[in-house]
Amino acid sequence: MDASALKSKTDDSSRKFIYTTAFLAALLPEYIAPLLTLAGFVVFKRRYSLTSQKVRLGTVGKVFLAFMCYSLLSSLWSLTPLYSAAISLLWMGMLLGSFMVSNLVVKKSQLETLVTAFSLGGGAVGGIGLLQYVVLMLKGHILNPLWGFFDKIIYELMPFDITYTATVWEKSRAASTFDNPLICATYLIMILPIAVYGFISGEKKHRRLCGISAVLILGGIAGTTSRGAALAVTASLVVLLFINSKKALSIFVTILASAGIFILGIVKRNEILEFDLEKSTDSRLKMWEACFKSISERPLIGFGAGCESTAQRMAEFGVRRPHAHSLYIEMASELGILGLLFLFVVFGFIIYDIIKLIKLGDGWGKLGIAFLAIFIGFAVISLTEFTLQTPKELQYFMLVLGMLEATKRMAIENKTEYGKERKELLKEKTPKEYTPV
């Protein structure tokens, strides 16, 4: 088999892993889903080596990897060194998915297939969540989270003690295939703009599937009855208004309908739990107060990667929670102000790439708006939730980053090729200089 045939076979088999992971991982338990990324990368790297190809790393990937190295270094001063090292290595492992996507998705058709895979996976998760919520509202019984009983067994077998305990029976909010409703909401918020893009601007044969998936995703988010998720999805949908002016009205109606569903869901949840907004806010404030006291004791470098160190510190101040319920406060607690600033640098490069993609215009600009909606939704929900906590959250965040890098490369190459073709065309049309005989 010649080099080009081997390369084609290599890329095709590795891409199947990407599509499978994008669709299936969200439906699997937290301790199984990451294996898809790791197995896919092993196949990808091994076959890449056979063809003497080099893995290209984008700027975001390089900076993020540097951040993770700092995170791993924090295990030297961590309150929970083994846990910190394990969490840092998990982040690095999931980053491999980003490299795989950005190197293998090199054509628009492949990108559209990936969009569909993400959308269908999100639709399945949202559909399960919506079903759970409806059954709970009807006072019925249903597995919620879907893998809760297995989660409890697995977490008890961990080689180190952890504060987090698996939720076996969530009585009022949908968790779908995730550990709890807030983690589910974070995932769905990342996938919603992709599904909306697929419905509005994707391949015609997949638009209906993406549209149905988007509706199910919204239903799943509503089923979590999370106020933070409601705010995040609203911000995300507002950005998506700019993706297509002809369909802006339908998106606006969707925003209003979603707002109504969220309000009804939250009111119903409060009735069931006798749990009001004031009590919820007070709980968050107590957590954050404990975290700020902790951060003030070691402001620069924190207490080590992983939320277990934060949980231990909060417990010392009389607050028993598994993490800070805010990505930004959690990072400051784990890795100090230096780590938080490092994370903001990573986010800065992500925003730069998104803006660059939007400026390239054409169909690429629409995808850029979808990525902007993802990032804004993620940034908003991160204010009140620790959004990079679990393996699946990390896995999908990295896969989406890989998709952004792949899209940016394709857009730049497409623009460059168009520029070359235009120059050649202009050269042909320029009248040749008359040379007298």
Features from the language model and the residues they span:
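Long extracytoplasmic/lumenal interhelical loops at the membrane interface
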Residues: 172, 268-335, 359
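A conserved mid-to-late transmembrane alpha helix and its immediate loop/hinge
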Residues: 176, 180, 218, 289, ...
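Membrane-embedded alpha-helical segments of multi-pass membrane proteins
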Residues: 28-47, 88-97, 184-192, 230-238, ...
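Alpha-helical transmembrane segments of multi-pass inner-membrane proteins
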Residues: 21-22, 39-41, 72, 96, ...
